[in-house]
Swiss-Prot record:
Protein name: Type II methyltransferase M.VspI
Catalytic activity of the protein: a 2'-deoxyadenosine in DNA + S-adenosyl-L-methionine = an N(6)-methyl-2'-deoxyadenosine in DNA + S-adenosyl-L-homocysteine + H(+)
Disulfide bonds: none
The keyword Transferase appears for this protein: yes
Role summary: A gamma subtype methylase, recognizes the double-stranded sequence 5'-ATTAAT-3', methylates A-5 on both strands, and protects the DNA from cleavage by the VspI endonuclease.
Xref: Pfam families: N6_Mtase
Entry GO MF terms: DNA binding; N-methyltransferase activity; site-specific DNA-methyltransferase (adenine-specific) activity
Domain of life: Bacteria
Record's keyword terms, sorted: DNA-binding, Methyltransferase, Restriction system, S-adenosyl-L-methionine, Transferase
EC assignment: 2.1.1.72
Family: Belongs to the N(4)/N(6)-methyltransferase family.
Record-linked InterPro entries: DNA_methylase_A-5, DNA_methylase_N6_adenine_CS, N4_N6_ade-DNA_methylase, SAM-dependent_MTases_sf
Gene source species: Vibrio sp. (strain 343)
GO biological process, one term: DNA restriction-modification system
Length: 408
């Protein structure tokens, strides 16, 4: 094992992909796959943020299973035109119920396609959960899913009382849109014209209509040309939050009616990584109705999925956010998140934990910013296997955290 270099405090924002690969003893391709799936977050073309690396190392890496899979190639054979033809033929033949057609299409997408496009379709039960936080009577409200895919949010909107003529869906995948239309026609008995092929980010400036409810699952980590991403981020004033999902958030807020509801299903990083600070602060300027931890609902994707539902309305000092994690549900003052460093949404903590953190942060204190050097420790991925109690050829002596005491 070889210890990686120390980084000066001013350099800790980013770590090169090659350094991460060396530290974790995997290939650069594996690191890039982890970037695609949302575990690590790009700082530049060839580096990741130090914060996401530390979080990945501490919270995700460490199981031998993950390391065994690290260099395993993703399924990369994907004939989308052939898949399109198959789906069109099935629709024309009426051989499969539209609900089943949705499942067939989603399961036919290769892992490489999903990762490239950031496509992980919302499970039906999760889509249903979002609607539990809306008013009971939605009959006069308008609904939009700007990344509607095969239509799980759209179908649930009909079931919850939205009129079909008030439901709008956009996507760039014509096959997914055709499935959405088929499902809505099967459910409502009429074909609606509000389901359109449209690149929502490019078209958001041209959409004059505003909506009362916008629920969506935006692409996770989809790559946009840097020029397009920077242009969108600047025009939408996204601050330091330039990930695709953050840009979708600001674009959606732009077409949401005052007092309207916005619900996003997002990767775990959105709620706690520094690069999303700007979008979290934008969310905190509104009433955050609920924060929900859905665990790991996507097959083949280890990152957690979490939901945020907010109302486009200024919060008062007494506003409480419903926080759901597993079987636990409690209400937490929204102000707690405003006081957190980087406005982190640590909503899966218990009420007592949140009170302790708030108390600690309220005490006058100093930080190590500008006064310390930051270094990467040795990352084995499996300490039980690679950290030995006796000397052996090719190994070097190291200190564990527990070896360091106040006396040295």
């Amino acid at each position: 094992m070889k210890q990686s270099a120390l980084f000066e405090a001013d350099d800790v924002e980013a770590i090169s992909i090659d350094d991460v690969a060396f530290s974790l003893n995997v290939s650069s391709a594996s690191v890039r796959n982890w970037i695609k799936t949302g575990y690590l977050h790009k700082a530049t073309k060839n580096s990741v943020t130090a914060e996401s690396f530390v979080a990945f190392k501490d919270e995700i890496l460490g199981t031998e299973k993950l390391n065994q899979r690290a260099n395993k190639s993703l399924k990369d054979q994907h004939d989308h035109s052939g898949l399109e033809e198959m789906i069109h033929n099935i629709i024309r033949s009426n051989e499969v119920h539209p609900e089943g057609l949705s499942d067939i299409y989603e399961e036919s997408l290769s892992e490489s396609y999903k990762n490239k496009e950031g496509v992980f379709y919302t499970p039906k039960e999760i889509a249903a959960d979002f609607f539990d936080y809306l008013p009971k009577d939605c009959s006069e409200l308008t609904f939009c899913d700007p990344c509607c895919g095969t239509g799980n949010f759209l179908i649930e909107a009909v079931k919850r009382g939205f009129k079909p003529c008030n439901i709008y869906g956009y996507d760039i995948d014509e096959v997914a849109l055709e499935i959405s239309r088929s499902r809505l026609k099967e459910l409502c008995g009429v074909a609606e014209s509000n389901i359109e092929k449209r690149d929502f980010l490019s078209a958001s400036y041209q959409i004059e209509q505003k909506y009362d409810v916008i629920f969506t699952n935006p692409p996770w980590g989809k790559k946009l040309p840097k020029k397009d991403k920077d242009s969108l981020a600047d025009s939408l004033a996204t601050g330091n939050s330039k990930d695709t999902s953050a840009i979708f958030f600001f674009a959606s807020m732009k077409i949401l009616n005052s007092s309207g509801y916005l619900g996003f299903l997002l990767q775990d990083a959105f709620f706690n990584i520094a690069s999303y600070e700007s979008v979290r602060k934008a969310a905190l300027a509104n009433q955050i109705v609920a924060l929900i931890d859905f665990g790991k609902p996507f097959k083949g994707l280890l990152t957690k999925a979490k939901g945020i539902i907010l109302r486009k309305q200024c919060p008062d000092d007494q506003h409480a956010t419903i926080c759901v994690s597993g079987n636990t549900k409690n209400e937490v003052s929204q102000r707690v998140f405003e006081k957190n460093p980087k406005s982190i949404f640590n909503f899966t903590c218990s009420e007592l934990d949140l009170e302790v953190v708030e108390h600690i942060l309220s005490i006058p204190h100093k930080t190590l910013r500008g006064s310390a050097r930051w270094g990467l420790g040795i990352v084995t991925g499996n300490n039980k296997k690679f950290c030995l109690p006796e000397a052996r050829g090719g190994y070097i002596p190291v200190y564990k955290g527990s070896d360091i005491t106040r006396k040295g």
